[in-house]
Amino acid sequence: MARPKKKGRDIHGVFLLDKPQGMSSNEVLQKVKRFYQANKAGHTGALDPLATGMLPICLGEATKFSQFLLDSDKRYIVTAKLGERTDTSDAEGELVESREVSLTEKDILAILPQFTGDLLQVPTMFSALKHQGKPLYEYARQSITIEREARPITIFELKFISYEAPYLTLEVHCSKGTYIRTLIDDLGEKLGCGAHVAILRRLAVADYPADAMMNYASLQHLSETEALEVLDEYLLPVDTAVRRFPKIKLTTMQTKAIGFGQRVKFDNLAQIYGMVRLYSEADLFLGIAEITADNVIRPNRMVNL
């Protein structure tokens, strides 16, 4: 007779994991899900195994809003090794080209402004983007190159941190869809020496604070030594995933109507339009909705807590 499946928990919130180097995002996602005994979990944009840093993991109803974190700005600190290009544009790849590095800090500072603002970036072949249903990295591992279209990205800030040849360290504030490996590869070509990512750490996703992260070893220790209620204390509320949207409080009647999936007329004195966070009179998070041009609240994604 098959052993009955262990029942998980309907636990809801966002856990800010400081992802360790060497583990894939999906691997740590499954570990965190198991530590919390959660029925449902999802991450908000993969980090390469080489990379460390912030990986928000959504549990339960928070998974409904993971796309909004995926679409949010990110901050990284990256150390590039100049003079070497690899096939993956990071330290885990095969060396494909070596060049002499004879750059000064002044040379680098003169180039950096060309990599800020609205740019077009061609994604690396070693990415999870799909072609005919298969990730590009699977083609790359078979030495097959697929033509990729350049995609619009925004580098809000590219801050010089240090340069001790051949290592250059930068802080990057960027839009969704930015490949730091590609950015460094492109920068290396512009500098005339080539480059690849040696160290990569994600500092922030959206406006989540770095000091709210917990490292994997600490979480694992808690899961082995403490009750689940202790782990639950480290979950951030579901609505933090959509904190960038304005907050709207509904009356009891409006809350009931929204609960039935109905559109509700809204006395829009503040003239707020677009996506908003909805709350009950008791300040309970209900979900997100769109306020239309004719002042109607149209439910988008509602929670079931």
From Swiss-Prot:
SUPFAM superfamilies to which the protein is assigned, alphabetical: Pseudouridine synthase (SSF55120), PUA domain-like (SSF88697)
GO molecular function terms listed in the Swiss-Prot or TrEMBL record: RNA binding; tRNA pseudouridine(55) synthase activity
Annotated CDD domains: PseudoU_synth_EcTruB (cd02573), PUA_TruB_bacterial (cd21152)
Pfam families reported for this sequence: TruB-C_2, TruB_C_2, TruB_N
EC number per UniProt: 5.4.99.25
Keywords: Isomerase, tRNA processing
One GO biological process term: mRNA pseudouridine synthesis
Catalysis: reaction(s): uridine(55) in tRNA = pseudouridine(55) in tRNA
Domain of life: Bacteria
Active site: D48
InterPro entries, alphabetized: PsdUridine_synth_cat_dom_sf, PsdUridine_synth_N, PUA-like_sf, PUA_sf, tRNA_psdUridine_synth_TruB, tRNA_sdUridine_synth_fam1_C, TruB_C
Biological role stated in the UniProt entry: Responsible for synthesis of pseudouridine from uracil-55 in the psi GC loop of transfer RNAs.
Family: Belongs to the pseudouridine synthase TruB family. Type 1 subfamily.
Protein name: tRNA pseudouridine synthase B
Organism: Haemophilus ducreyi (strain 35000HP / ATCC 700724)
